[in-house]
Amino acid sequence: MEFLNQGDQASLLANTSNEHASLMLKQPLAWSPLAEKQTVKTIVHQTPKQTGRPSEPDWTVWLDKVRWVFGYGSLIWNPEIPVVRGLLARVDGYHRRFCISSTRYRGTPEQPGVVLGLDRGGRCHGMAWELVAGQEDLALKTLWAREMRNGAYRAKLLKVKLPSGECLNALGFVARREHPNFLRLREDELLRRLAQCRGDRGSNQDYLANTVHALQHHGISDQKLQQLLKEVQAQRSN
């Protein structure tokens, strides 16, 4: 797995023009209280079945709003979008939870897996990724095809807090409790899915393990996920 740590960031800046690097470091990380109110209702529409792609208005409306993306699960260890740097960040009012059914990436229609969502309450530590200027359209297209395929998430600008105390606006994908794919699994069923299910992108156990290891790499301790991983590994070894 590749991570954008401080060494990577220094290397990236060293290979960037002095003018561009200076601009990246001096730009304000501004947050507006209006950000949390901004959601786009068109995003809840289902992906057109004939193309398998999200409709353009779903992501183009964000082009002038999004400079940062908040990752709390696989977007930490596999963002798949052009980014300049990643910063440790925290979102209040939401927590990371296995609450979204996965019938493609980590499961199948016959054996659905489960992936993470931002659910109401608590707080969530993750990564804020700064998008490469001029490539926002590519980043958003990629994110919509990946995260918004079945409408189980709602795209929302979140107030993201940095360790420095600064705040910024970041696009996040929040679980939609009203969606059929939103789950409230019993612990035994959650463990079963994590231990047994597999989809186009690999096993559910790998998804969990990669997330735990990525969080630890960045100095984030999620004890709930760490305990889940221990129990899943124990279940698989029996």
Say what each PLM segment does.
Residues E2-N238:
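A glycine-rich, hydrophobic/aromatic-adjacent loop/helix-cap motif
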